[in-house]
Amino acid sequence: CIAAHTMGTNGNSVQVQYWTGSAWADLCPVTAVTSDEPIMVIFEPETRQRWRISITGGTAPEVGVIKFGTAMQMERPIYGGVAPIPMARQTILRSNYSETGEYLGRVQQRSYLSASYSWQHLTSDWVRANWPDFQRATEAEPFWLAWRPGTFGDVGYCQVDEVPIPSNMGIRDLLSVSMSVRARGYD
């Protein structure tokens, strides 16, 4: 996963590679980066000690965050009610007016992305096996979130203001969990 970068602006291409012990092997094809949105490369698990990101073309980019790790796939998908993170823009504006009420202008104080996710009917076994590690990780640092990565390329480099806590649904051993995330804007 890569975030806080300028590879789209700089016209770069990216490729993920790992060391086999004698040479670098390609994990994915060279891919042109078309925006400065966060990037998530999903692949079959590999146990390797050395990884690298090969960046080619364009001018030298700035890259703020790179992480390798195991992606947690939710037990059940979310089908509706989700605002695509790139379109969930929240902008705080400050307008200025004259003494007589005439509009003088506006400044943008900050902009970020904000979305909410809610999963239902998660089995107790799955939640107990997978959620505690994720929950602790959200307390410590931002994380990447991809909604339906096989269909859409929407990826957010997110953080939570409140730790997401699963709750019993009252149906057999099923739980639900919701979280509101704030993501870094990239423009």
PLM segments and residue spans:
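Extracellular/virion structural assembly segments
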Residues: 1-11, 22-187
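Beta-strand signatures of extracellular beta-sandwich domains
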Residues: 13-17
